[in-house]
């Protein structure tokens, strides 16, 4: 039986043609505004499509052929989505990468994906490669060239590669099909509540996959307008831009909301804003409640990953309550599976309220085709018909999912598994704490303790934090040590790098 909420997959399809379909219906509508306090650079749907297909023709003139990889080493500029869509338009495979990567990291990627072309912004690090390198300064000359034709084909064919954030220690190239964009229709309805009338302002950079999907591909797919701040826009400027450019939706990572709140000294009203969106890492209840109090707006959170984008979310028509993350989007098949069925546990979904691994069915059109040149790693992520996310959660009686953290991040307290998310949620409510990350750190061989790392104006006594936790957490979950740091380490995707925190054995120097 076909799920009426699942997207229809056509026999012939091209992701770029789908995303830019409104260029033929509303060619003069503004598709993109790149904004600053000084003004805006605007692109119509007609201009976006012309630039994309002009670039695509230029790529073909370089004798690139279907399946060739195009590595994007581009900064926070409009060239990023244009090159991405141009490659997709003619069956090349774009490989978007973070501008923060070092030359050493880029060299590894070049070895892995063997690009046929690198599009390079001179301000961004790259590495030597046995392929042509096209400077971003050369791209505008191609925008007005002869437009290429969209190459239609099997919707299940390889469309693009994206790299994971490397939470397991090794970033992997994830293969996605052209059809993956269609799975995002379930997000439009059950996260964004998105329509062609919206103006979605995304606080992220062009060269971040969260911005690329939520901030650009999705608005364009429905004929809406995307609004992106210029590079290096300060967080305290974002409220002004939201007002001035009539944003109806605002999307950002949790850290951006926190930075805006830290600079607000009075409540603020956004006349056109309907609601806000958050993803990338867990949104703390404290940030969500502070934002609601200062703006009157609700932040709707979503959970996903490079391998499947977002598939659990809250939305205006189905808000999350309490500490839950949200609900499986309609059209998705999501389950909580036992962490270790080989230890005598059942193989199917665990009972309601029981912790386990969040899994999504392998029939999901947004699920990856696999990891690039890594069939064994791909197989290890599958259990029967389910893809294992590596994240822990528990399903509630109403179907919502409570998020408990990455499997890799789970801590061990005397043999009892503890979620860092649970501890962080409580500590984030302590007055004075701005950000917090919790992990276990080895004190000596085979002995680890739970440590909380936090940012704040001043040190907060361990005893004060322990007393705060005592009424809220079981004793074995309370951090044995709390350390104030200047900032929390993050990986190139902006997520907290707990692996780096686990290595902080220096915090025990001088202690017995």
Segments from the language model and where they lie:
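Conserved AMP-binding/adenylate-forming core of the ANL superfamily
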Residues: 31-77, 81, 85, 102-107
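Conserved AMP-binding A3 loop
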Residues: 42-46, 159-183
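Conserved AMP-binding/adenylation subdomain of ANL enzymes
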Residues: 182-199, 207-249, 263
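Conserved beta-loop-beta connector loops within the AMP-binding
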Residues: 335-361, 397-398, 458-462, 497
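AMP-binding/adenylate-forming catalytic domain of the ANL superfamily
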Residues: 474-496
């Amino acid at each position: 039986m076909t799920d009426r909420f699942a997207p229809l997959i056509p026999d012939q399809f091209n992701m770029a043609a789908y995303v830019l379909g409104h260029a033929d219906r509303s060619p003069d509508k503004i598709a993109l505004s790149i904004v600053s306090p000084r003004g805006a650079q605007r692109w119509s749907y007609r201009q976006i499509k012309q630039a994309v297909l002009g670039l695509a023709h230029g790529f073909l003139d370089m004798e690139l052929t279907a399946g060739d990889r195009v590595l994007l080493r581009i900064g926070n500029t409009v060239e990023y989505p244009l090159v991405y869509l141009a490659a997709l338009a003619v069956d090349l495979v774009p490989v978007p990468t973070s501008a923060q990567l070092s030359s050493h990291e880029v060299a590894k990627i070049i070895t892995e994906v063997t690009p046929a072309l690198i599009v390079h912004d001179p301000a961004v690090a790259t590495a030597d490669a046995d392929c042509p390198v096209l400077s971003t300064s050369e791209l505008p000359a191609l925008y007005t060239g002869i437009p290429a034709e969209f190459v239609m084909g099997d919707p299940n064919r390889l469309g693009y590669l994206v790299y994971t954030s490397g939470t397991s220690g090794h970033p992997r190239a994830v293969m996605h099909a052209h059809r993956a964009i269609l799975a995002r229709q379930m997000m439009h309805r059950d996260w964004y509540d998105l329509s062609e009338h919206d103006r979605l302002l995304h606080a992220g950079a062009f060269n971040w996959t969260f911005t690329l999907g939520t901030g650009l591909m999705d608005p364009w797919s429905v004929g809406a307008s995307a609004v992106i701040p210029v590079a290096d826009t300060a967080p305290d400027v974002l409220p002004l831009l939201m007002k001035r450019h009539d944003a109806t939706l605002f999307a950002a990572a949790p850290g951006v909301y926190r930075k805006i709140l830290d600079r607000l000294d009075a409540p603020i009203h956004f006349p056109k804003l309907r609601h806000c969106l958050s993803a990338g890492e867990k949104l703390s209840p404290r940030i969500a409640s502070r934002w609601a109090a200062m703006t009157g707006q609700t932040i709707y959170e979503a959970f996903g990953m490079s391998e499947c984008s977002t598939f659990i979310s809250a939305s205006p028509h189905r808000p999350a309550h309490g500490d839950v993350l949200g609900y499986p989007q309609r059209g998705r098949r999501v389950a909580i599976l036992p962490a270790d069925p080989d230890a005598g546990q059942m193989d199917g979904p665990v009972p309601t309220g029981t912790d386990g691994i969040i899994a999504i069915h392998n029939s999901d059109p947004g699920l990856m085709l696999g990891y690039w040149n890594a069939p064994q790693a791909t197989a290890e992520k599958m259990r029967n018909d389910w893809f294992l996310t590596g994240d822990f959660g528990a399903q509630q009686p109403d179907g919502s999912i409570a998020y408990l953290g990455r499997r890799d991040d789970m801590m061990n307290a005397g043999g009892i598994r503890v979620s860092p998310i649970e501890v962080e949620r409580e500590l984030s409510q302590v007055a004075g704490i701005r950000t917090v990350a919790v992990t276990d750190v080895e004190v000596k061989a085979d002995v680890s303790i739970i440590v909380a790392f936090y940012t704040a104006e001043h040190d907060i006594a361990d005893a004060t934090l322990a007393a705060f936790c005592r009424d809220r957490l079981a004793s074995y979950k309370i951090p044995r040590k709390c350390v104030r740091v200047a900032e929390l380490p993050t990986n190139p995707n902006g997520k907290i790098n707990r692996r780096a925190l686990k290595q902080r054995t220096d915090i025990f120097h001088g202690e017995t």
